[in-house]
């Protein structure tokens, strides 16, 4: 196996482990919300958190099946990370903003400008969409609505 394939396999396994940690953090935040330690609307958190956790766990299952050696695995991992953050940011706009750096950081492990650029563009488009989706179906944020109204 050449060094490039070995690096890609290693990056796939590392990214999958990172997303498992993200899934555990989401599960912990969900439990803290259910026990009313975090103050988030349960009608938003209860339907979205299982979907987010599912998206974050899919790469670990794929890597377990394939060993992370297939060429398409990196695309599946980055797709799942972007979609998980998109759902999080749509449901909770205030809390999902910083999480948008995660897919880009994961894409940097592959040492591919094209892949990082593609991840950045997808993240920017979905981040913009999540702001508008979050205004209407996500957690209420009057400041976000005022900013959208007064900016044009």
Where are these regions (language model features)?
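Residue-level signature of transmembrane alpha-helical entry/exit and packing/kink sites
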Residues: 73-74, 78, 97, 142, ...
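Transmembrane helix interruption/hinge and helix-loop junction motifs
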Residues: 89-95, 111-115
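N-terminal membrane insertion elements
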Residues: 109, 114-119, 124, 128-152
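Hydrophobic transmembrane alpha-helices and their membrane-interface boundaries in multi-pass
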Residues: 14-92, 99-105, 123-127
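Short, Lys/Arg-rich, polar N-terminal cytosolic tail immediately upstream
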Residues: 1-10
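General secondary-structure edge motif
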Residues: 4, 87, 108-109
């Amino acid at each position: 196996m050449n060094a490039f394939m070995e690096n890609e396999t290693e990056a796939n396994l590392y990214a999958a482990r990172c997303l498992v940690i993200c899934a555990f953090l989401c599960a912990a935040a969900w439990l803290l919300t259910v026990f009313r330690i975090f103050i988030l609307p349960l009608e938003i958190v209860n339907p979205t958190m299982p979907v987010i956790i599912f998206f974050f766990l899919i790469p670990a299952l794929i890597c377990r099946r394939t060993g992370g050696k297939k060429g398409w695995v990196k695309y599946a991992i980055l797709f799942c990370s972007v979609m998980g953050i998109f759902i999080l940011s749509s449901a909770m706009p205030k809390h999902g903003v910083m999480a948008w750096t995660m897919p880009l950081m994961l894409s940097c492990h592959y040492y591919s400008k094209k892949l990082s650029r593609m991840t950045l563009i997808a993240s920017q488009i979905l981040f913009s969409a999540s702001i508008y989706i979050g205004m209407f179906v996500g957690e209420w944020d009057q400041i976000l609505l005022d900013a959208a109204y007064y900016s044009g």
